[in-house]
Amino acid sequence: MGMKQKIMIVDDAEINRQILMAILGDKYEYVQAENGCQAVHMLQHDLTIDLILLDINMPEMNGFQMLERMNKFHWIDEIPVIMISSEEKRDIIERAYILGAEDYIRRPFDAFIVRRRVQNILNLY
């Protein structure tokens, strides 16, 4: 069997990171960050990430600011991002797509939808 695909989960709430890893199972390798600043620092040293699951509302650097940074360094062209948030406002969701997110998953999580969307995005890249 080949190497596991690597998913970075960026969320300031550890419980949300744990839930996502539990939903997705041991099929993937995981890297965790508590905010966009930490995630960007990690990406500067390791671009072998296959997918980023990115929360919007976080301290230090939020999800939108991280997407802007990823655009600046052209990482957004290489690493797909799925935004995760409980936010339902259309303008927030649209902003995620405009900044380069491939998809948007709302909390509370539906396990089937999370697994399917993650697999669909990974199959495209």
For each feature predicted by the language model, list its residue ranges:
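Receiver (REC) domain active-site loop signature in two-component systems and cognate sites
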Residues: 58, 70
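A Lys-centered signature of the CheY-like receiver
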Residues: 59, 107
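Acidic, metal-coordinating helix/loop segments flanking the phosphotransfer/catalytic sites
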Residues: 32-51
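C-terminal output helix
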Residues: 91, 109-118, 122
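Two-component/phosphorelay signaling modules centered on CheY-like receiver
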Residues: 13-31, 44-45
